[in-house]
Amino acid sequence: MDKSSGELVTLTPNNNNTVQPVALMRLGVFVPTLKSLKNSKKNTLSRTDATEELTRLSLARAEGFDKVEITGPRLDMDNDFKTWVGIIHSFARHNVIGDKVELPFVEFAKLCGIPSSQSSRRLRERISPSLKRIAGTVISFSRTDEKHTREYITHLVQSAYYDTERDIVQLQADPRLFELYQFDRKVLLQLKAINALKRRESAQALYTFIESLPRDPAPISLARLRARLNLKSPVFSQNQTVRRAMEQLREIGYLDYTEIQRGRTKFFCIHYRRPRLKAPNDESKENPLPPSPAEKVSPEMAEKLALLEKLGITLDDLEKLFKSR
């Protein structure tokens, strides 16, 4: 529903865009590859608290689940995210029988953004590991009281089967999670920006996060963007990665921004977003906003903010804490 006009808007995936559930875009489910050999071989298990986003699902509401966690291998942007895009496209474009969808393997590869010119062996080498990682990603819904615990455990994809000789792919999803595939708070994610950011996984990850935000978003803290990337390097290095990724997003024409500081906290003010990487006919619709002037902070408040930052507590964390009370 377009809030400004009241018009019902249908979002349809095609080769240039995909409809992505907002939850998976905002959460750190798909993250950059850990570059260093030291980090790439350990701590590869990712654990994400998805309670705030996924307790809105009818499954969680019906069963009274109050905690949702996503656990599994790190899913990267360069291969795994594109495979997930292919899965979303498959369920949107093809006839779903029961909880399964079947389509030609070559077509599935195209939906994953893999050129059909690649050999069958190279297709398998790219798709097979990604399907295994996605199928190995567990989503658990639970509720615990003083005496008992109830938990429902499922997977991002229940099963995947392919046969290159017969040219088929079969994908099976948990019917109770179909709502996740067709979440009511969807955004249209343009793949043009993703394709323009080949091998720039940090920029790709920040793009999926920023594009999921509402129109005229509030300033985004540097700490929040660090959390979205879920890197393992020192904070100083992570800050450099975030700034480099934001500059890459500006270079391809997706956005413009200003970095500001309030107290000891750094923020990015987003002036506009252009998922098609070109200016609209009416640029006034972008509502570019000047950066908010830095608010004067008392020395006492500055000390408190510095202590919170030292403890790794962000303003987002405080907001969630107050909401939960």
From Swiss-Prot:
Alphabetical keyword list: DNA replication, DNA-binding, Plasmid, Plasmid copy control
GO terms assigned for molecular function: DNA binding; DNA-directed DNA polymerase activity
Keyword DNA-binding in record: yes
Annotated spans, Disordered: 279-298
Pfam family, one: Rep3_N
UniProt keyword DNA-binding present: yes
InterPro entries reported for this sequence: Initiator_Rep_WH1, WH-like_DNA-bd_sf
Taxonomic superkingdom: Bacteria
GO biological process terms, semicolon-separated: DNA replication initiation; plasmid maintenance
Family: Belongs to the initiator RepB protein family.
Function description: This protein is essential for plasmid replication; it is involved in copy control functions. In vitro, binds to the DNA repeat units, BCDD'D'', EFG and HIJ.
Name by which UniProt lists this protein: RepFIB replication protein A
